[in-house]
């Protein structure tokens, strides 16, 4: 678990020396949260999506992207339903700082892995009907994270697009292959031997990734190579996913800002 202080300067302070394309956070969305930028070459110009919030029943839809010289790729989504209230912020160009409070302790632990091993800054605050079970919160958190990823990626110019990583954890080993293609698909080959890890229903692992895939538009293959400890299998999965996603979202300098597709476009449509 990351132990560094989780400090978020305001957006105006973070970009005081330059004009920012980001509006102030909407009223009622909580305190403004910004992530420290990780610098790139001066010739690299990104398109950053404007942070968006959703109403009841939505998954979070990013507004049209605007030209920006801001290095960090940020996504923010607020998803509110009768079952859950979820607020997600993600910085693809972060330093691995996590601040998660989902009401599901084991999921908080897994989101720490996503941040730490992906070097993403991840902020997730959620409340929900966990007195029934964790299903709704688990699903809606994943839907919001997927939408925030989609938003932060923008038009995906210059990224590697593909990621592949195998992570071991003691006797467990899990392989993850992904493509930020805009085409949602999940193949999940996990064999988790117990029904629960702590209070967490292990059936929710596959459902988490299916929900994330649906809104992010990625193709994701998960294959368990070894393992007989449920905690180790799930944690190895999140670690491998984090490293594969980091690889896919990082920049290929040889592309010089071009879209990594022979079609010339990567989108959900």
UniProtKB/Swiss-Prot annotation:
Q: Which keywords annotate this record? A: Amino-acid biosynthesis, Chloroplast, Histidine biosynthesis, Lyase, Manganese, Metal-binding, Plastid, Transit peptide
Q: Which GO terms describe its molecular function?
A: imidazoleglycerol-phosphate dehydratase activity; metal ion binding
Q: What is its EC number?
A: 4.2.1.19
Q: Where does substrate bind?
A: 83, 109-117, 135-139, 161, 183, 231-239, 261-263
Any matching Pfam family? IGPD
GO CC terms for this protein?
A: chloroplast
Reactions mediated catalytically = D-erythro-1-(imidazol-4-yl)glycerol 3-phosphate = 3-(imidazol-4-yl)-2-oxopropyl phosphate + H2O
Q: Report the subcellular localization.
A: Plastid, Chloroplast
| InterPro entries linked | IGPD_sf, ImidazoleglycerolP_deHydtase, ImidazoleglycerP_deHydtase_CS, Ribosomal_Su5_D2-typ_SF
Which coarse location class applies to the principal site listed for this UniProt protein?
A: plastid
Biological pathway: Amino-acid biosynthesis; L-histidine biosynthesis; L-histidine from 5-phospho-alpha-D-ribose 1-diphosphate: step 6/9
Residues annotated as binding Mn(2+) 2: 135, 139, 207, 232
Q: Name one GO biological process term.
A: L-histidine biosynthetic process
This entry's comment on the bound cofactor is:
Binds 2 manganese ions per subunit.
Transit peptide per record: 1-51
Instruction: Give cofactor(s), names only.
Output: Mn(2+)
Sites where the protein binds Mn(2+) 1: 109, 136, 231, 235
User: What's the family?
Assistant: Belongs to the imidazoleglycerol-phosphate dehydratase family.
Note the PANTHER family from the entry. Answer: IMIDAZOLEGLYCEROL-PHOSPHATE DEHYDRATASE, IMIDAZOLEGLYCEROL-PHOSPHATE DEHYDRATASE HIS7
Q: What is this protein called?
A: Imidazoleglycerol-phosphate dehydratase 2, chloroplastic
